[in-house]
Structures are given as structure tokens and as C-alpha cells.
């Protein structure tokens, strides 16, 4: 139980900017399996802020921009940075140089464009979203896609934090936190079956697409998986709620 608590704290410390007491020991090895639960915490916070903005009658476009800004602040832009680096890498035709480009901390044109598309999709979708509870599902499923990418596909670098997540995970055993969370949310915040199935389909397809382009995954592509899954889920849920 102590190890699970340290893994959970490690997930909070690594994947968010939420404060953790320095007196609390954290453990990164094995922390990745708790990513969807981190999404639950962040999604719940965003849902609460959305309720407050609605109560204050803040115009929908402004409220959506505030939510996305808070979304970025809570994660420190960790996943968006990975999506940008991945986009820059995929813009290079030479597959051997892609990892080198992705490791460059400087943002390129394709990375900036990818970030703009992701943020625009999120802001515009949120401005039309009817049920704020969907935010919880979006953040949970986005991180479940990352867990699937870690479990299913090879890691392309010999070292790095992503390598720790890959080598310390024991799958399929370590899917139990994700499975439990999806089961709980299905009862507490039920989604229409079609939307849930589409979300699960994205969880399979998006990591597979990056695998086909890169030959595996890196920490950057894990971030890209989270961001694109979240953005496309928001679009799908918005369209589904409007139809």
C-alpha cells in the first residue's frame, strides 16, 4: 500500500503542477498506471471551474479560453510540449533524424501549428459543450491512451523518464487502476454508449498511428497521444451532444 501511495504521488508530481510536500516520498517507477486517475483529479477541477464560470454568467468563448489556460497551467504544458516536438519530428522526411529533431528544445513551425490546432479545437469545442462532466471523461481517456501506448509499443530511446515508465510497468496487470476507473465513471458519469466506444477506439488508433510514423514511442509522443486524444474527444463529444 505504501508503494502504491508513493506511485500515486509520483504521478501527481510528474504529470501536474499541483504542490506536493517535499516530506512525502515519491516514486516514478510504476507511476504511469495512475495517469487516468490524475486525469480524474484534473478533470474534476476543470469541471468545478466551469460550473463557477457558468454561475457567474461568463460568456462561453471567454469561459472556454479560461478553462484551456487553466488546463495548461495544471499540467505545465507537459503534454502540449510533447505534441509540438512530435509534430516537428514528423515534419522531417528522414526517419533517422526524427528523434534528433524531437529532442531539440526549440519549437519549429510545425510544432507551433500543431499547438494552435490543438488549442483551437479545445477552445471551440468547450464553448459548445453542454455537459461539463464530459471534461472528466476527456482527461481520463486521454491519459488512458498514454497508458496503452506505454504498454503496447516499444520505447525508442535507451534512457529518459519515458523509459522508466516503460520498463517499470507490468502489463496487462497494471491496467487494473484504469479499468477500475472506467467502470466507476460508467456508473457515476455515464456516457452514451456510442461516445464511449468512440473514445475507446481513439485510444487504440492514435497511439497506433504514431507508432506507424515513428516505429515506436518516446516521452514526446506520449504527450502527443494525450493532447490529440483529448482534442478529438472534445470535438466528438460536442458533435454528439449537438446531434
Curated annotation (Swiss-Prot):
A Pfam family of this chain: CobS
Catalytic activity, as annotated: alpha-ribazole + adenosylcob(III)inamide-GDP = adenosylcob(III)alamin + GMP + H(+); alpha-ribazole 5'-phosphate + adenosylcob(III)inamide-GDP = adenosylcob(III)alamin 5'-phosphate + GMP + H(+)
InterPro entries membership: CobS
Enzyme Commission number, as recorded: 2.7.8.26
Cofactor(s) listed in the protein's UniProt record: Mg(2+)
Pathway, per record: Cofactor biosynthesis; adenosylcobalamin biosynthesis; adenosylcobalamin from cob(II)yrinate a,c-diamide: step 7/7
Swiss-Prot/TrEMBL keywords: Cell inner membrane, Cell membrane, Cobalamin biosynthesis, Magnesium, Membrane, Transferase, Transmembrane, Transmembrane helix
Catalytic class of the enzyme: transferase
Sequence intervals crossing the membrane: 8-28, 36-56, 58-78, 107-127, 131-151, 187-207, 222-242
Localization per Swiss-Prot or TrEMBL: Cell inner membrane
GO cellular component: plasma membrane
A GO molecular function held by the record: cobalamin 5'-phosphate synthase activity
GO biological process terms on file: cobalamin biosynthetic process
Top-rank taxon: Bacteria
Coarse class of the protein's main subcellular location: membrane
Bilayer topology: Multi-pass membrane protein
Function: Joins adenosylcobinamide-GDP and alpha-ribazole to generate adenosylcobalamin (Ado-cobalamin). Also synthesizes adenosylcobalamin 5'-phosphate from adenosylcobinamide-GDP and alpha-ribazole 5'-phosphate.
Family the UniProt entry places it in: Belongs to the CobS family.
UniProt-listed NCBIfam families: cobS (TIGR00317)
Name of the protein: Adenosylcobinamide-GDP ribazoletransferase
Organism: Thermosynechococcus vestitus (strain NIES-2133 / IAM M-273 / BP-1)
Taxonomic lineage of the native organism: Bacteria, Bacillati, Cyanobacteriota, Cyanophyceae, Acaryochloridales
Amino acid at each position: 500500500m505504501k508503494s502504491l501511495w508513493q506511485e500515486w504521488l509520483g504521478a501527481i508530481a510528474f504529470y501536474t503542477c499541483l504542490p506536493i510536500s517535499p516530506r512525502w516520498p515519491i516514486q516514478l517507477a510504476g507511476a504511469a498506471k495512475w495517469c487516468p486517475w490524475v486525469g480524474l483529479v484534473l478533470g474534476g477541477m476543470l469541471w468545478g471551474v466551469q460550473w463557477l464560470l457558468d454561475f457567474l454568467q461568463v460568456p462561453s468563448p471567454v469561459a472556454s479560453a479560461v478553462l484551456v489556460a487553466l488546463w495548461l497551467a495544471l499540467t505545465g504544458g507537459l503534454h502540449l510540449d510533447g505534441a509540438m516536438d512530435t509534430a516537428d519530428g514528423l515534419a522531417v522526411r528522414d526517419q533517422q533524424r526524427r528523434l534528433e529533431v524531437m529532442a531539440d528544445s526549440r519549437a519549429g513551425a510545425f510544432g507551433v501549428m500543431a499547438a494552435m490546432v490543438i488549442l483551437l479545437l479545445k477552445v471551440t469545442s468547450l464553448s459548445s459543450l453542454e455537459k461539463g462532466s464530459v471534461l472528466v471523461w476527456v482527461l481520463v481517456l486521454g491519459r488512458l491512451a498514454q497508458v496503452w501506448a506505454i504498454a503496447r509499443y516499444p520505447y525508442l530511446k535507451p534512457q529518459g523518464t519515458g523509459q522508466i515508465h516503460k520498463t517499470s510497468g507490468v502489463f496487462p496487470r497494471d491496467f487494473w487502476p484504469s479499468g477500475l476507473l472506467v467502470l466507476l465513471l460508467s456508473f457515476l458519469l455515464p456516457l452514451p454508449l456510442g461516445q464511449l466506444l468512440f473514445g475507446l477506439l481513439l485510444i487504440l488508433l492514435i497511439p497506433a498511428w504514431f507508432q506507424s510514423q515513428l516505429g515506436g514511442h518516446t516521452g514526446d509522443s506520449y504527450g502527443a497521444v494525450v493532447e490529440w486524444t483529448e482534442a478529438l474527444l472534445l470535438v466528438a463529444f460536442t458533435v454528439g451532444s449537438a446531434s
